[in-house]
């Protein structure tokens, strides 16, 4: 286990039902904020049109994924719609040690495992709700990524996903994309001011005390 006191960044877990906007929000936030990075998951699902290995996901075969599980490479992993997704330990630890804040676009299973991991003191969790079920269904249809059968399955699973909303610290209704995006960035800024998130604060307080001693001795 890596000493978490060396970490300088925080982890932002964003979850939502499929179609509620978590991936679009996460990508836009990362694009506009150079100190925020995206957690690139490993997955066994096939790449979609336009996706590149190592950008949206690290695409692997199931045998390779199982080997990574055996070798304890993941902070968390879960099966979603018949495909496996996992978060790499070494990738996350490197980004945190480089001072990056990291956004996770994960379902409630992944969110729970990250919050319960050894990195839990660094985690901030956000759940995104759709403005209505009708809007959620329309978004799934309009993105043209899935056939009708898969859309129906995603709608069924969405109810289960939404049932976990109360496990998250911050809840937002995605009825205004730009507003929600700005609010998430504000949350990140505020959370980094919390005492337990400012891991270099004890060193700074020690420095102030040394300066006090020097000031008193010279007075």
Question: Locations of the language-model features?
Answer:
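Extreme N-terminal, non-catalytic leader segments
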Residues: 1-11, 34
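N-terminal phosphate/diphosphate-binding loop that engages ATP/GTP or pyrophosphate donors
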Residues: 23-73
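NTP-dependent small-molecule kinase module
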Residues: 2-5, 145-146, 160-219
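Ras-like small GTPase catalytic G-domain
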Residues: 121, 133-136, 141-163, 178-179
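Short glycine-/polar-rich loops that comprise or flank the Walker A/P-loop
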Residues: 9, 119-124, 166-168
